[in-house]
Amino acid sequence: MLMLKNGGKPVLFFEMKANAFHLWKNLNYLIPWIIDWYVNPNNQWWYNWLYKRHKLILVSSKEVYEYLLAKNTRLNIRHLALSLSDRYKITSNTCYEKKYDVILIGRQNPVLKDFLDQYKKTHPDLTIFIPSKQELASRDGYLDSMKKSRVALYATPGIDGGEKRTNGFSQVTPRFLEMVASGCNIIARYKTNADTDYYELEKFCPVSYTHLTLPTKLEV
């Protein structure tokens, strides 16, 4: 989303992914807020040049922010984390009616998916919910699907084959926050980094499932 220039004042715009065709937006009055900085470290010099005219650059990932600082980037960067609107806030009194045991939503981590498949073989009564396109057609429908589910599987993107797509960066995505706001118990797989520390993943799912073993009972 690009916000139009207003009287020469700084303009914030969202850039979903840092890209090599940024040059046309390299204007000093624009402040990019970059969501996915999946830049190959070997090409870092090119992106320093592409973004050099911006007086301020925001990045959503604390992992990326600390990485760029460690590389002595010349860019004036700040960390501005992704979050959810206060209207999704829950309290200890929030209670959603749960219809399904586990939800599978979005891109699945292959290790967690295999773990679930193996568990299902020994626990055939486990209900697994895969929402339809129609159920996910709106944001309300998307969140309602998670609110119906007791357990959700979550993994950061840069592991288990995702490294190629993200160049090894593995930030926490908004889906984790949406699962929390939907009252799901989360089984998570992630590598600890500045981003997982920032969002305090260990408080929600203290074990990163590096070596999965099948429990006798899935606590749902």
Model-predicted segments: where are they?
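Conserved acidic donor-binding segment of nucleotide-sugar-dependent glycosyltransferases
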Residues: 205-209
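Ordered hydrophobic segments in well-structured contexts
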Residues: 10-12, 211
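Conserved small/polar residues in nucleotide/adenosyl-binding loops
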Residues: 210-216
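Active-site proximal beta-strand in glycosyltransferases
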Residues: 12-15, 23-39
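Surface-exposed flexible segments
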Residues: 27, 32, 117, 168-171, ...
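Nucleotide-sugar donor-binding catalytic core of glycosyltransferases
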Residues: 1-2, 6-7, 14-19, 37-48, ...
